[in-house]
Amino acid sequence: MNIKRLAASGVMLAMLLTGAVMAHGETADFGNPADFKTGMEENFYVQEGSFQELDTIKMASQGKLMSCFGNNAGSVYTVFFLPPAPEQDYAIGNPQRGWADEAPTAIDDPEIENYPANPFFSPAGWQYKLRQDEALVLFTGLPPQCKYYSFINYILFTQEKELKDYTGEKAYFRVGNQDIGLYHPVFGSIGSSIHAGNVKSTDGSPYGSQAVIVISANQTVTDTVLAQLKASGFSEDVINVMTIPAETYRMGLEKGKDTFAFLGRISQPESQEDYDAYIANLKETSTVYRVTPKEEVADALYENETLIPRGTGVHEAASLPRVEGHLDEMRKAIIAQYADEYDYEELTGDIAVPEGLTAYTKDINSLGDNRDTSYLMTRDFTLNSDEDFIVVYGVNHTATGKAQYSNAVLYSRPMLNGICSVYDSLFTGSAEDYLPEDCAEADSYYVYKMARTQMDDYTGVIEYSTGNEKGKFYGADNGATLLMAFRAYMDETGVGPSYYEIVYDRTIVFHKK
């Protein structure tokens, strides 16, 4: 870390870096990452990476990202950027496309033959191979008050299976080459997330405090890291351990081994100013180390984590008298309002993606799944004129207690870029005109439009791609292939609701006659 630069950035940044954060009048028990690094270097190579925002729409618009992976429009994503492992080649970019090379490892003995590079995927460095005896250690401030945040590990790319035809697979593309291996995306979650409900941090608050996250597939290495953290002044109650089951995944640096990634999510901050400052300063106020033993450590494997099961045993419909009757009344009222001037098509949602380990064993793309939410998705459709529009409607999952927050997002193919999003915080009052006046549960439902222009107070505006000053993937033009997706984040179990305990959201696409 550049201490001079931090000092110039202000006292708060320096406090965040050194751990001198005050909690209820006391100094938080948080050591100095540099002391940890020094203590580990006797028996380990310690390389520093960075932890920072990955703006999927912006980077895709700049030609630096091949897919937006179904980004949750309105949320921010943060990732590790790591150097290759010791004695591993760096991935070569493509200058003609503006894709920079991966930064090389700092440990490269010319007398030792290197392991092959990671398959190149722009921006270089946010996906990486891992030896079974390596650890990643993150020292970071936690997001300010918000509706939701989490940190999750992922298997990002896996080697293509010999003689298998992937051309018909959804969201398939290829990276790599014959020398380092041919890969395709799985982007499947590994285990549980760390989130505001379970994080261990400096002052007991999940917001604005500090935490350490240790990622490892080897119990012996984890124990060594934990011992050094404690020796460096970090108390046990700020340390979070995330494990990777090395026998499940293809760990190692050799050709064809899996690549991994670490993803943070933040949604709906309470203070936009605090959030903007957090993201702008995250790279400077956080530290991430890649820790590699100088002598290989024998396997000390973790088993697959026992996950919290989805579901409470109570269906959402149980809290809503006449739920199907109310939904039918809403449907009829919506169609009656527009049917004279518009043709329409009704779309149902289905489970969009499998959970991570299921995707890995099926050898398909899970698009960065997260067990903290449910994912529903419609079939594809188009908007053919400026007068065409979309109506989404259904049960407000937050009002029924099945979600901490919920939203509907419009996506464009093939990039799966989220271009318009509406959140449950906007739903209050939106269904009143479509239900009988005596309906006491009107705010347990919602009706919202997505259109080219503001049709009423309950409309999200769909931007165009062509001529969009922010970038071409911030919108979609008429005729583009679109789909709707719906999320419901976290019920009382601490994970996403069961797909068999929620009322599925509905979509009507109206086309001008």
What is each model feature region?
Residues 1-10:
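Bacterial N-terminal signal peptides that target proteins for export
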Residues 10-18:
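Secretory targeting and sorting signals
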Residues 25-513:
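A compositional/structural signature for long, glycine/proline-rich flexible linkers
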